[in-house]
Amino acid sequence: MAHITFDTKNIENFVAAHEFSEMQPLITMADEQLRHRTGAGAEYSDWITLPTDYDKAEFSRIQAAAKQIQSDSKILVVIGIGGSYLGAKMAVDFLNPMFNNELADDQRQGVKIYFAGNSTSASYLNDLVRVIGDQDFSVNVISKSGTTTEPSIAFRVFKQLLEKKYGAQAAKKRIYATTDAKHGALHDEAISEGYETFTIPDGVGGRFSVLTPVGLLPIAASGANIQDLMNGAKDAQEEYSESDLTKNEAYKYAAARRILYDKGYTTELLINWEPTMQYLSEWWKQLMGESEGKNQKGIYPSSANFSTDLHSLGQYIQEGRRDLFETVVKLDNPVSNLDLPHEAGNNDGLQYLEGITIDEVNTKASQGVTLAHVDGGVPNLAVHLPAQDAYTLGYMIYFFEMAVGASGYTFGINPFNQPGVEAYKTAMFALLGKPGYEEATKDFRARLGE
């Protein structure tokens, strides 16, 4: 099958060929730390071999659970936050039509997927409860600890809604818990109540977990082919098995990013030209930001959805500070296409476009914008996708994961932890009056003048 390709021709005005050769020793060192598990955080690097070394029996249970959900539910509510949310959301959006939840049942591959537990908004939860109404639904709650605030709140709400609708015993059969194999509040409740459970592997961090049960159950329930997803990742694992930058495009992406960073390009914009890829950017931002942003180092990950954001961010990208570069994820073959309709007269000025498809307009717009941005001093990298399908997605997931793993080690940091997130949690728990935070509560409330 066709693979994704990485294109560096639009950084040639910014990066000389010899700079990649000079980066090779640093990439080789990073590769050794990754593959030999000698780098910081190596205990969380099982994702490297995950496409070939995963629990096949559990994988079959996931497929069976997805079929069960499709047989007894119209809706699956997926409860999780961060890595327990973004990977599944990204994949479900990527692999299904834009308005999948609005399609009639016979026009969808699987059930409607809605996400909860990813914010503290009461309005969001109320609105989702109203959307569900009297439709049959199931819940997939995803949390390693079972005590993360946002998912725990949402789980209470939807668990009680299930119990009210189906009764306590029948509700238990509609709850699927993805959690720690041995410990934690959710694990203990799942065992006690008899929920079907799936395991979050100890050696895979949240932002790398989309190819584990964390992502696989929601993706399968949506009707996507998760075997194709894993096959794509498996082929990428084989393709990116060498450290040589002339043979490993994931590492070449990591090297290009690091070279640009060293030249002062400290912000990366991930660009897409398809609305179904908006959450690809959100997943990527967590993957890159949590992995690299440590010790006052790292590339700041941002994103833009083109052509929409050209009408808001286009001016800044063209003429603002020259500290950013773009990585464009471009789909070479759209899932569907549309001819521009003929219309008598030329009031809208579009007659010159008649006879071509709307995707051709999208492609030419992408090419033109790239040329303009490069001319304006913005280095441009490109990741080309041959198709918008499960195989390609699995391949691309592994591409970005390998790139950031290597990139993190080139910065001399641990790419697999996220110690900085504890600061906001401490402040939030203290202000909410959580037991054990009494001293911090006094301090933070005093600072707020309470």
From Swiss-Prot:
The record's listing under SUPFAM superfamilies reads: SIS domain
Q: In which pathway does it act?
A: Carbohydrate biosynthesis; gluconeogenesis; Carbohydrate degradation; glycolysis; D-glyceraldehyde 3-phosphate and glycerone phosphate from D-glucose: step 2/4
Give any GO molecular function from the UniProt entry. glucose-6-phosphate isomerase activity
Reaction(s) catalysed (UniProt annotation) = alpha-D-glucose 6-phosphate = beta-D-fructose 6-phosphate
Q: Which domain of life is it from?
A: Bacteria
Q: Does the keyword Isomerase apply?
A: yes
Where are the membrane-spanning stretches? Answer: none
Q: Which GO terms describe its biological process?
A: gluconeogenesis; glucose 6-phosphate metabolic process; glycolytic process
Q: List keywords of the entry alphabetically.
A: Cytoplasm, Gluconeogenesis, Glycolysis, Isomerase
**Chain coiled-coil ranges:** none
User: Is the keyword RNA-binding assigned to this protein?
Assistant: no
Which family is it part of?
Answer: Belongs to the GPI family.
Recorded protein name is: Glucose-6-phosphate isomerase
Species of origin reads Leuconostoc citreum (strain KM20)
Which taxonomic lineage does the organism of this UniProt entry have?
Bacteria, Bacillati, Bacillota, Bacilli, Lactobacillales
Source gene? pgi
